[in-house]
């Protein structure tokens, strides 16, 4: 997934940082300027990076040039685990990551990726509101400040081969990100063997058929051209791709209170605007894939089996990854 992950964060943040362009302002004195080194898997020149730059202009405007973002895009800093490690080591200051990356910092956040738990946007909004303070404290306790949440469309199963019920995955090669215990457990519950590789290896894996099935949004599949290697798409979704942006706590609190407020406010406004774009574009991508000839799979006749696998996955992860109180 250099490509998927790139797409993933392209999407997940699609809007994670959209903000109207601001007027340019004079640079602050170099001795007073704070540069936030921000790691992203989004490719240079992508729509996401254009949005990131718009966020940066607004941040610079709001802080009168005292704070700005410096982007390290295209996975130049590695995968999400590398981002988090480098932020902790002081080599980076912030990163945009998926729930998998967020879970490396605060493991209970992975509950948001549990299959079948959050499948509609209104559910996501309620859950995000209800758990935001709790998760924010978890991030702080682990040395990070949560800047915002983002999303990247509805998670669906895509495959090169036909499928309809959970049992069909036993003869397929489903990908599970090596740092994601949630989907890997889901695959194990079904009785299949997940292909556990890092994000940068996924696209090549599809080319060589090392793997043939992936959980991804229609938006990501179109943006990264995955659809050219995938033939089947589930009509029903397993969840919603969720992620966010985090910054090292020491870096954040080194800013003045005014600049902290500007950073949080601009990122939050951007994220919410981006959510609207992600939802719209994911729906358009879904329709586009159907028009391009991908075979739509109706999994509803086997809903009971899918729901049972999802419920067993959540049960298995409760107490090991997240607490029952989060469900």
Regions from the PLM with identified roles:
Residues 1-5:
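N-terminal secretory signal peptides that target proteins for export/translocation
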Residues 6-8, 176:
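Intrinsically disordered, low-complexity segments enriched in glycine/proline and serine/threonine
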């Amino acid at each position: 997934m250099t490509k998927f992950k790139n797409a993933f964060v392209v999407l997940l943040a699609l809007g994670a940082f959209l903000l109207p362009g601001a007027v340019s302002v004079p640079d602050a004195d170099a001795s007073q300027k704070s540069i936030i080194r921000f790691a992203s898997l989004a490719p240079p020149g992508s729509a996401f990076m254009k949005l990131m730059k718009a966020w940066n202009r607004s941040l610079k405007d709001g802080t009168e040039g005292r704070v700005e973002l410096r982007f390290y895009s295209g996975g130049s800093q590695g995968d999400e685990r590398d981002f988090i490690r480098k932020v902790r080591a002081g080599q980076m200051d912030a990163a945009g990551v998926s729930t998998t990356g967020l879970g490396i910092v605060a493991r209970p956040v992975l509950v948001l990726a549990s299959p079948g738990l959050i499948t509609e946007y209104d559910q996501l909004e309620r859950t995000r509101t209800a758990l935001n303070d709790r998760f924010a404290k978890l991030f702080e306790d682990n040395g990070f400040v949560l800047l915002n949440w983002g999303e990247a469309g509805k998670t669906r199963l895509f495959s090169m081969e036909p499928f309809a019920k959970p049992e069909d995955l036993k003869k397929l090669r489903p990908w599970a990100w090596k740092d994601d215990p949630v989907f890997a457990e889901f695959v194990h519950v079904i009785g299949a063997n997940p292909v556990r590789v890092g994000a940068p290896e996924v696209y090549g894996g599809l080319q060589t058929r090392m793997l043939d099935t992936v959980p991804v949004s229609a938006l990501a599949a179109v943006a990264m051209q995955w659809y050219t290697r995938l033939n089947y798409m589930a009509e029903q979704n397993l969840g919603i791709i969720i992620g966010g942006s985090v910054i090292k706590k020491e870096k954040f609190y080194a800013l003045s209170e005014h600049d902290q407020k500007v950073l949080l406010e601009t990122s939050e406004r951007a994220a919410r605007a981006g959510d609207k774009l992600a939802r719209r574009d994911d729906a358009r991508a879904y329709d586009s894939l159907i028009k391009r000839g991908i075979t739509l799979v109706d999994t509803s006749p086997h809903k009971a089996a899918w729901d049972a696998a999802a419920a067993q996955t959540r049960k298995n992860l409760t107490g090991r990854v997240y607490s029952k109180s989060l469900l």
